[in-house]
Curated annotation (Swiss-Prot):
GO terms for biological process: lipoprotein biosynthetic process. A 1,2-diacyl-sn-glycero-3-phospho-(1'-sn-glycerol) binds at R143. This is Phosphatidylglycerol--prolipoprotein diacylglyceryl transferase. Keywords: Cell membrane, Membrane, Transferase, Transmembrane, Transmembrane helix. InterPro entries: Lgt. Belongs to the Lgt family. It is a multi-pass membrane protein. It is found in: Cell membrane. It is an enzyme of class 2 (transferase).
């Protein structure tokens, strides 16, 4: 049966327009665009200034690519220091080699720094909730770029049923041999990229379009939920990987820990009096950000809200402390 399948070498690229346009960068670009459009939807819903949105884009887009590549380079240097980039170079990003951990970590840190300095204009809790979970749809689409590059596959599947169940076309591209081996060693692999893509789509729908859209959790908690979800999925997939390192499992557990701490902080410890919670439908809520400002001239307390026109000063005073 396997004799009917052409063996693909690990890292062999699939072209949309041969030899100029690879599928890999197109998939990454599409994932970014849908993530950006999702954030824009919630940004407009919260009536945030789009000048800050475009400033964040200027930070996030390049830093996500740089961070993803740097993390990949770091991984290669750790696990194969003698020859980390066989037949390639550390900067050859067009040949694949992006790590989602770095693609999230670096832009998240830089975005938090920007939002901190603009905290009088952007509610950082809501920004975290609306930005971080949208990474899931970028991951889901980006995994198909990995598929096109014949990477992010699992261990050998002797029967090939894990791929054949999704059709012969997909199974053909899962008949792979490692870059440091001969074509004779080619075998069916578990379609790990597909499992991660499907799980990311499910997480995107639940976290973004059910929990976030309905404000079922307090502002900020969704950002933590992303880390918990991603870490859990990553940890569950680790046993299926061709090369499973303790480092990856440790990173996944750290992601779950950080996400859990964020959720506890925003749901329990963070000052709830900064928000006015309003039920606007069945299982649908609205959190209005409020802030106490003391006028320096007349020493009077003023109350600001991102949706002040829908709240009387009495209602705001009821929920806001000095």
């Amino acid at each position: 049966m396997t004799s009917n399948f052409f063996p693909y070498k690990e890292g062999t690229a699939t072209f949309l327009i041969d030899p100029y346009v690879r599928v890999y960068p197109i998939a990454i670009l599409m994932g970014m665009i849908i993530s950006i459009l999702t954030v824009a939807f919630f940004w407009r819903k919260e009536k945030f200034n789009f000048d800050h949105f475009f400033a964040l884009l200027f930070i996030i887009i390049p830093s996500s690519i740089i961070g993803a590549r740097l993390w990949f380079v770091f991984e290669r240097l750790i696990y194969n220091p003698q020859n980390p980039f066989p037949g390639s170079a550390w900067y050859a990003i067009w040949e694949g080699g992006l790590s989602i951990q770095g693609g999230v970590a670096l832009p998240a840190i830089l975005s938090l720094v920007y939002i901190y300095f603009k905290r009088d204009y952007i509610d950082y809790r809501k920004a975290l909730s609306m930005i971080l979970p949208t990474v899931l749809i970028g991951q889901a689409i980006g995994r198909w770029g990995n598929f096109a590059n014949h990477e992010v596959y699992g261990k050998i599947d002797p029967t090939g049923q894990s791929s054949l169940i999704f059709g012969e076309w997909l199974a053909r591209h899962m008949f792979i041999y490692n870059a440091n081996e001969s074509a004779a060693s080619a075998a069916f692999r578990y379609p790990l990229f597909l499992y991660e893509s499907i799980s990311s789509i499910i997480g995107y729908i639940i976290i973004v379009w059910i929990i976030q859209e309905r404000n079922l959790l307090k502002p900020g908690s969704n950002g933590g939920l992303y880390f918990v979800y991603y870490g859990t999925v990553r940890l569950a997939m680790e046993p299926l990987r061709e090369e499973s390192y303790f480092y990856y499992s440790l990173a996944a557990m750290f992601s779950i820990l950080i996400g859990g701490m964020m959720m506890i902080y925003f749901e329990i410890w963070a000052n709830p009096s900064r928000y006015v919670k309003t039920k606007i439908g069945k299982f649908r809520y609205q959190y209005d950000w409020t802030k106490v400002v003391v006028d320096k001239k007349d020493k009077k307390i003023k109350f600001q809200s991102n949706n002040n026109k829908n709240k009387t000063e009495g209602k705001i005073k009821k929920y806001v402390t000095k």
